[in-house]
Amino acid sequence: MARKTPIERYRNIGICAHVDAGKTTTTERILFYTGLSHKIGEVHDGAATMDWMEQEQERGITITSAATTTFWRGMEAQFQDHRVNIIDTPGHVDFTIEVERSLRVLDGAVVVFCGSSGVEPQSETVWRQADKYHVPRMVFVNKMDRAGADFLRVVDQIKNRLGANPVPIQLNVGAEEDFKGVIDLIKMKMINWNEADQGMTFTYEEIPADMIELAEEWRNNLVEAAAEASEELMDKYLEEGELTEAEIKQALRARTLNNEIVLATCGSAFKNKGVQAVLDAVIEYLPSPIDVPAIKGIDENDNEVERHADDNEPFSALAFKIATDPFVGTLTFIRVYSGVVNTGDAVYNSVKQKKERFGRIVQMHANKREEIKEVRAGDIAAAIGLKDVTTGDTLCNSDHKVILERMEFPEPVIQIAVEPRSKADQEKMGIALGKLAAEDPSFRVETDAETGQTLISGMGELHLDIIVDRMKREFSVDCNVGKPQVAYRETIRGKSEVEGKFVRQSGGRGQYGHVWIKLEPSEPGAGFVFVDEVVGGVIPKEYISSVAKGIEEQMNSGVLAGYPVLDIKATLFDGSYHDVDSSEMAFKIAGSMAFKKGALEAQPVILEPMMKVEVTTPEDWMGDVVGDLNRRRGIIEGMDEGVAGLKIIRAQVPLSEMFGYATDLRSATQGRASYSMEFFEYAEVPKNIAEAIVAERGY
């Protein structure tokens, strides 16, 4: 089969935003205008096509990112058919992992902001994640019909708060109830969408007289930004003072692809104004799979290789999401980077080193699916029938093995104990938790060694609430949930040199393992670093990995209070062995003994998750809010002006002090203040609190 749409006419984009910026509504409108859904789904009616889990429809938030394929020809049918793959990403901070996964496989993004609340904390998180993966993006300032909506104020915040370089290509005509339409600064015409047919048709009109001056000022900014794309354009602009429409568009595209500028548009998805213009901008300015750098990976011999977006290259794809579907079982969402694969083809999972077979391939349209026979470079689709694939695995051609860059996932910060209500629930709970953990790498399941309780940990209270809710609904498991616990960690601040000796020699086959280890802190975030400096074969090669295993096992069970130990560098530099009695087990135990002893001598400390907290409050309550944050061991980082005279307080607060904060804040401010929080880093716990934690854990 030949390719239906040339790859340069593909756009793989994500729609990202803060909770409530109107991201799902925007995606719904896109599906409506591209002809996929005949009735527009409203989020507040719980009928949006992209939000297909029951919990999403009830809570009005998007939890999993659904991938949808649509086609677009332009507002005036000025383009050939372009295939747009849209991934709708959740905006709630507990689901940052979903955003991270989506950005990893996208070529471009549309970031949606609310016209009245502007740049909010989660917007900064999404923006930083997009920076990390160098994703070219554009901005849609939505909800221009809302009270307090101000497009240029939001553009200003994007510049100052996000450090970006926004270039508006539109201006709004009117705002709040009087929002009429937008001015296209390239054509210098006003676009007026017809309300009678839900904005399907529109007319170009002259710019209102009172806005001509403002439009000309912003038009000049736009042309200047375009001229900076190259010296030739700059010379032409300086000589003639103008560029052609085609030159402007080409230049803006080039600078967007280089992440030098971010084009800004505005509208109101709910009022059906401005969304088609966003689609046009996606096609004109965001990259196709061949406009972004080739993905890098490593081959079997650890050499770096590149895979280009080309059907003739060997097949390579990244599994970026696993979802359980009520009808077909497990769906593995993949982004194909190179080559072609057909249904029934065998592929190789290079991370797990296992062969897999593509049973069926489906293209998702929100929660409807269409079976297809093949996928090609640039496609995003879901495969059915893959047995052992987890998020972040690479699927490739078994003759051309490659491991594409792995994704990094955040450490969970909050933990609760769950207990099945009955014997029947026990077995079902194990299966349910296993499936849910396979879908979501930021959710972990473990068993407490002492109490035998099942502990689940995640990115926040909402995250775990939804997991428990899904166990009940999808797997009909009833369970009792304990109080949330903070996921503390341990590390060392000093150095130590220690001996670990495990000897049992009382007749018959004995045990003999003997090691000398240096312990010191590794770089923050580096995890466990093991260095082998054994010389002269004092410990045989085959036992060295056992020493590392022993250390790692002891790290997982902690030394001070039983919490996992982070960021340690262990150097094995000496030891001895016995010809008969030495074994892998003996050296593993010796390594574990040495680590426990050494860590206790190297100034061990307990770490706690610090959260970045932003509280938005009327000025009258500012003193109370700041006083309360200080009582919670918070560090106030700064204050900003919010909309409508509200104040924004930015602070770092330990997670352990934030339980129940929502209720306390509501009662302290008569419900007028709101807050958001996200994980920032692990920091050392003050001595008095550390002592209390150790005592409570009975160490």
Curated annotation (Swiss-Prot):
Give the principal location in a single coarse category.
Answer: cytoplasm
Keyword annotations of the record: Cytoplasm, Elongation factor, GTP-binding, Nucleotide-binding, Protein biosynthesis
The UniProt entry's GO biological process terms, in alphabetical order, are: ribosome disassembly
- One GO MF term, please? GTP binding
**Cellular location of this protein?**
Cytoplasm
In this protein, which residues make up the domain named tr-type G?
8-290
Query: Record's Gene3D superfamilies?
Result: 3.30.230.10, 3.30.70.240, Elongation Factor G (Translational Gtpase), domain 3, P-loop containing nucleotide triphosphate hydrolases, Translation factors
Assigned protein family: Belongs to the TRAFAC class translation factor GTPase superfamily. Classic translation factor GTPase family. EF-G/EF-2 subfamily.
Q: What is this protein called?
A: Elongation factor G
Species name for this entry?
Answer: Vibrio vulnificus (strain CMCP6)
Source taxonomy lineage?
A: Bacteria, Pseudomonadati, Pseudomonadota, Gammaproteobacteria, Vibrionales
